[in-house]
């Protein structure tokens, strides 16, 4: 546009200067900020979050009778499933509890390993 100057301040941050000298700052060229300026969360963290959301949606869809309209905390078994799905990306191998170990800490061998009230 004639008379307007666009300057890059840093990636995804631009100033637009109008002919009268007034300026505006435009972030992400007007796109969604959390996508265009995503510098806060690495992809691994986002993958965990999206996996939690996806498993929660599947749980709600396949078991609607267990979830009347309300707000729920993600069940521990699903949270632990997401963690297990991401172990390879960390180069981690997880062993299975022996029955006596599970009994000692008061959980089932297959989990979940934390009580429902526990918050990570």
UniProtKB/Swiss-Prot annotation:
An example Gene Ontology cellular component term from the record? cytosol
EC annotation?
Answer: 3.13.2.1
Q: What is the documented function of this protein?
A: May play a key role in the regulation of the intracellular concentration of adenosylhomocysteine.
Molecular function, one GO term? adenosylhomocysteinase activity
Which biological processes are named by the entry's GO terms?
A: one-carbon metabolic process; S-adenosylmethionine cycle
Organism of derivation = Streptomyces fradiae
Top-level taxon of origin: Bacteria
Catalyzed chemical reaction(s): S-adenosyl-L-homocysteine + H2O = L-homocysteine + adenosine
By its UniProt entry, which Pfam families does this protein fall under? AdoHcyase, AdoHcyase_NAD
User: Record's SUPFAM superfamilies?
Assistant: Formate/glycerate dehydrogenase catalytic domain-like, NAD(P)-binding Rossmann-fold domains
Q: What detail does the entry give on cofactor binding? A: Binds 1 NAD(+) per subunit.
UniProt lists the family membership as follows: Belongs to the adenosylhomocysteinase family.
Keyword Hydrolase included in the entry's annotation? yes
So, what pathway does this thing act in? Amino-acid biosynthesis; L-homocysteine biosynthesis; L-homocysteine from S-adenosyl-L-homocysteine: step 1/1
Q: What is its main location?
A: cytoplasm
State the name under which the record lists this protein: Adenosylhomocysteinase
Needed cofactors, names only, are:
NAD(+)
Keywords attached to this entry: Cytoplasm, Hydrolase, NAD, One-carbon metabolism
Q: Report residues binding NAD(+).
A: 34
